[in-house]
Amino acid sequence: IRLAQHAEKCGVDGISSVPPIYYTGNADTALAHYSKIAESTNLPFFPYQLGDNSIPGNVHAFVERLLEIPNVTGMKLTTNQLLNISSIHNQAGDKLKLFSGSDELFCHATLCGTVGAIGTFYNVWGEACKHVMTEFVNGNYTLGKEFMLAFQEIIELVLPNAWTFLRKAMLLKYRIDIGQTKEP
């Protein structure tokens, strides 16, 4: 809550949050967590959906309750289940801007209703991915297919050592050392 309020004072356009990672268990816990953050500012709020950790049980009931929370204007959907993305889009319509959270599916997810993507590998390939997504949405499916197959090959190669790769890539590309991961 303090970080969300600080972000608002800094003039950001919106805030986001992962679900309660250490004390998960049910939809009520996730929705209470999101409500407290969303209600602490007037900023648009984009909760993360991380697989079954943040939408346990009935997805439609969860989305219905999520839409009742003030300032919720979208979601990041980190799932490989394209049917779930479509289902949420069909239920929420224009009430939620959906973002793909699975880098390896960002073109695929646009066909299911996402308006953009948020992910790890965009820190390195952001401009290329943005270009491909724009082209894909405008009908250049050949470019989308070719890029996605190559991008997925890279992701598959890097994934076992993703943090080491990302740390070195960020240092080489931006001269930013993002440091080692830390235990909670």
Tell where the protein language model's regions lie, with residue ranges.
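Active-site beta->alpha loop and helix N-cap motifs at the rims of alpha/beta catalytic domains
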Residues: 1-55
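Conserved short secondary-structure transition element at the edge of the structured enzyme core
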Residues: 110-113, 152-184
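Helix-coil boundary/capping segments in enzymes
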Residues: 1-2, 14, 95-98, 178
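Catalytic alpha/beta core domains of metabolic enzymes, predominantly
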Residues: 39-40, 51-159
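Generic secondary-structure boundary/loop-capping signal
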Residues: 19, 47, 69, 79, ...
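Short glycine-/small-residue-rich flexible loop motifs, especially phosphate/cofactor-binding loops
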Residues: 4, 106, 167
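Glycine-rich tight-turn/loop motif centered on a GG-T
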Residues: 19-28, 137-140, 181-184
